[in-house]
Amino acid sequence: MEFYESAYFIVLIPSIVITVIFLFFWLFMKETLYDEVLAKQKREQKLIPTKTDKKKAEKKKNKKKEIQNGNLHESDSESVPRDFKLSDALAVEDDQVAPVPLNVVETSSSVRERKKKEKKQKPVLEEQVIKESDASKIPGKKVEPVPVTKQPTPPSEAAASKKKPGQKKSKNGSDDQDKKVETLMVPSKRQEALPLHQETKQESGSGKKKASSKKQKTENVFVDEPLIHATTYIPLMDNADSSPVVDKREVIDLLKPDQVEGIQKSGTKKLKTETDKENAEVKFKDFLLSLKTMMFSEDEALCVVDLLKEKSGVIQDALKKSSKGELTTLIHQLQEKDKLLAAVKEDAAATKDRCKQLTQEMMTEKERSNVVITRMKDRIGTLEKEHNVFQNKIHVSYQETQQMQMKFQQVREQMEAEIAHLKQENGILRDAVSNTTNQLESKQSAELNKLRQDYARLVNELTEKTGKLQQEEVQKKNAEQAATQLKVQLQEAERRWEEVQSYIRKRTAEHEAAQQDLQSKFVAKENEVQSLHSKLTDTLVSKQQLEQRLMQLMESEQKRVNKEESLQMQVQDILEQNEALKAQIQQFHSQIAAQTSASVLAEELHKVIAEKDKQIKQTEDSLASERDRLTSKEEELKDIQNMNFLLKAEVQKLQALANEQAAAAHELEKMQQSVYVKDDKIRLLEEQLQHEISNKMEEFKILNDQNKALKSEVQKLQTLVSEQPNKDVVEQMEKCIQEKDEKLKTVEELLETGLIQVATKEEELNAIRTENSSLTKEVQDLKAKQNDQVSFASLVEELKKVIHEKDGKIKSVEELLEAELLKVANKEKTVQDLKQEIKALKEEIGNVQLEKAQQLSITSKVQELQNLLKGKEEQMNTMKAVLEEKEKDLANTGKWLQDLQEENESLKAHVQEVAQHNLKEASSASQFEELEIVLKEKENELKRLEAMLKERESDLSSKTQLLQDVQDENKLFKSQIEQLKQQNYQQASSFPPHEELLKVISEREKEISGLWNELDSLKDAVEHQRKKNNDLREKNWEAMEALASTEKMLQDKVNKTSKERQQQVEAVELEAKEVLKKLFPKVSVPSNLSYGEWLHGFEKKAKECMAGTSGSEEVKVLEHKLKEADEMHTLLQLECEKYKSVLAETEGILQKLQRSVEQEENKWKVKVDESHKTIKQMQSSFTSSEQELERLRSENKDIENLRREREHLEMELEKAEMERSTYVTEVRELKDLLTELQKKLDDSYSEAVRQNEELNLLKAQLNETLTKLRTEQNERQKVAGDLHKAQQSLELIQSKIVKAAGDTTVIENSDVSPETESSEKETMSVSLNQTVTQLQQLLQAVNQQLTKEKEHYQVLE
């Protein structure tokens, strides 16, 4: 934690602020005490009573009067603050407050601020003091002026004691003392400084001089003591409020007469008192300085205050008297002090707020620091976890290194064991060499000739063998270079294949996305099949082209298969030849085993044959590697064939999709048929409704006819009633009928308003209303006819029956309407259910297709990944085989060096054995020649095999060309696939995207992008490993070159040693010839012969010479010769010893060579160990790369499955395109029909909704009419009850009419009643005509709608 974050800092800031405020107030209270004490002392020292002359006083008064008009306010305003300061000082002295140490001083900035505040406050106080002075409470304020000479300082400063009590200045030069004292005062009291000084300037009569003197004084204050800043103080003591005013007034009253007297006497005593004043000023200055520098305790300060009180006792009495008049000023001062306190409190509150803000900022910073700490802790935790993980990895790697070290130790132990075994063999060989040297010493003379011949022969053989070996090495290098070139070509082919695969994968991903879009959109929107059809025709052409190219590929593949079969036959022939050679070699082995005499040679030949076998095995391994490569190429071709087959399968799947689309079209046709059936049903319903409407119209016509008949009958009845006499009864009946008619009119008006809203069923209601009105009228008429008609009751009953029938008809119509509404609702429900079922079926179809596609993609991905795994495993096996071959080559080089050493040793042994077996040379030489012939035959076979290898390389190049052709064809296929994809994308763009499928596609795309990123990273890793492998290969090549250089060095050394030996043997032979010539000078043998032949001839001739010599001479000669022979023998022994030493030297040289070879072998073994280590590291890296490859394979399975799905979909698309070409026109027509049907269905659906709404309205209206009809039935029942009464009244009327048949009044009344009835009938006819016209209009509208719908359906048909 930092300092600002601690709780100590939070507590410390407010405590500091509080202490500063407390010190501020305390210093403010105690500031001016010490200054006031000094001022009092100075004033007491300088208060000298002076007497003023009357003339001077009068002049002073006159000048005072002159100046009062302009400068009164200035003098008074300056005197009031001085009085205030005196009162303050006296009040503090009375209360005996302890002085404050003078070392506490405020800064200049706080002093300036206080100056500004006090300058604002003091003008108000000055005005109040001026008003009080004008009231003439204190008569001694006005002092007569004294003439003053022009000096830079005023002559008298006695009035300055109001500001600083006790300070009084003389006329000459008391300004300096006054200035020094004023520096201790607050800078805000500049305006109050020295009012008496201003009065003296007023006496001189120049306002400008007064202003200049003020300026000089203020300047002197700031110049003399700029370092002392006195703090202002406003006393807050309540007890000290009354006494300061009184003391101030008394001091002013006492000072002014003294001042006048001093001014009057100053002129006469100026010269005498100058020295005294100067001495007093110096003493006072020293006193002030000592006071400034001193520190007072509380007791000392109290003593100083008591002394000042004693000296200012008289002044206090005068001030107490004048304290009453200055209460108002003190109140104002208190108010100002309260204001200052409030300002200070506000400052304190502001500081507190600032402290709070600082604490809040501290809290926020703490929170931030806590957040940072938590983040750092989390980071530390993650780093610790990573550290633990790294430690675990390091531990694992350390364990692995320990295991590797253990393995290396085991290998070293094995190598040391092998080295020990080799040393033992070398010791055995050395023993054998020593034995052979002993044998050579006994048989030198016999073996020298044979050694020469054999040596020359062996040298020739060595040269031939070395030449052959060099040729073989050159061939090996060429083969290795060819193999590297083939590897580079294979790597390039692999890269191209990977690029092709990546391109195919991308295209498969795109095609899968497009296919998914097609599936979803084909299911969702079948309206755009027309555009697809137009594009399918183009794709059919491309599909035909693809099929043609596939046929070409199949033909090329058949040719390639034939070539491969021929190559396999050749390989089989070569294998058979190798087996035959092996059989021959076995026979030779058996022959060699049978020959005991030439066992050593046979062993050597076995070694040579073993070497040749190794070379053959190496060639066979190279052939096997080439076979593996051919198999890999064949697998690649098989993969291409599989790709082609997959394309075909996809075409078949596309055809299946087309079949599914055809099935979907068939389902659409079924749906259309169902729609047609529903349309027929709707038509039937409409026809039924029309039929019903026509029936209702016929019934309406019949009712109109009945109305007409009833009207005629009513007229007849009216004529009959007109003949009857009873007027009153008729009038009552008419009134009842009118009331009923009015009621019926109201009901009819309500019904008319309802009938206006009803569409098709208003006709029946209007007919019923007309029937009701007619029946009521008939009832009214029949009441009049009861006298003449007996069967009126039966008519009424028939009418009731008719009414009941009409009611039943109305109910039946309502039931029919409800049934029709139910049917319509059921149909709508069925339509909606069918739509939902269609949607569900489409979704199920889409899900099934997606599941099938996923399953197919998964299977295809699994197969492709398996193929990739196989290919990669084969590649790894080939790499391992190459590494093993290189290791074998290194081992073979080491063995070859050992074999060369063994051959050298075996040649030595052979030379010794040839000397022993001179007799058996003929047979062994023949066998040797035969073996050489066999070796030559094998070398010829090797050459044949090399030729076969070259042919295989040419075949491989041709196959690579075929692969390139196939790749070009694949590129063409890909371009066609891209075209198809573009077409599919165009088709897909016409379909609206489905949200769910888009989400799935986006997720799959993300997964594919992630897989591609992983593939790229793994490819980078594989390339890195390849680079490492190439580096290792280069190192191996360098090692091989170093081995070859060492071999050449060794061969050169061997050749040099062999040449030296030949030279030594020739020298020995020459020396032997010279010795023999010296022994037998007579014998002469040609020198052209070989050494053995020359010795044989020389022996023969020497024997002949020896035989021709005589006895004694011969004996002497023989003795002489024996002596010479002994000498020669000694010489020969010496020479033999020399030769032995030479042989020993040669053996030492050979041993050195062996040691150097062994050292080099050890070095090479170390290098081999290092190479083994690197190989193991590479194997470990290969294992890691294999693991990564396995991961890649597991991840690439999905991609390959997607590719297969794409191919499958392409096949299906091609099939679909083939089949869609036939259905283009039909689909277009179906689309048009579907669009029209959809429009019609939408219109019919909207019309059905409208009809439902109208039916609902009709139901409501019917309910209203039913209620009205029920009320009417109740009224009819009442009317039926009234009919009986009417019948009785009619019988009475008839009886009365019979009595009064001759009255004329009845005729008049009868003339009036038909008129009323005719008016009523006219109104009824008008209303009926209106209803009829409305119904006709509605019928016309309905007919128009029906005609429109019929035309619409005809158009649809």
UniProtKB/Swiss-Prot annotation:
Membrane topology type: Single-pass type II membrane protein
InterPro entries per UniProt: Kinectin (IPR024854), Rib_rcpt_KP (IPR007794)
Organism from which the protein derives: Homo sapiens
Complexes and interactors: Parallel homodimers formed between the membrane-bound and the cytosolic form, and also between 2 cytosolic forms.
Name of the protein this chain belongs to: Kinectin
Localization of this protein: Endoplasmic reticulum membrane
Record keywords, A-Z: Coiled coil, Endoplasmic reticulum, Glycoprotein, Membrane, Phosphoprotein, Signal-anchor, Transmembrane, Transmembrane helix
Positions of modified residues (Phosphoserine): S75, S77, S156, S1084, S1313
Residue ranges, Lumenal side: 30-1357
Coiled coil: 330-1356
Membrane-spanning intervals of the chain: 7-29
Stated family: Belongs to the kinectin family.
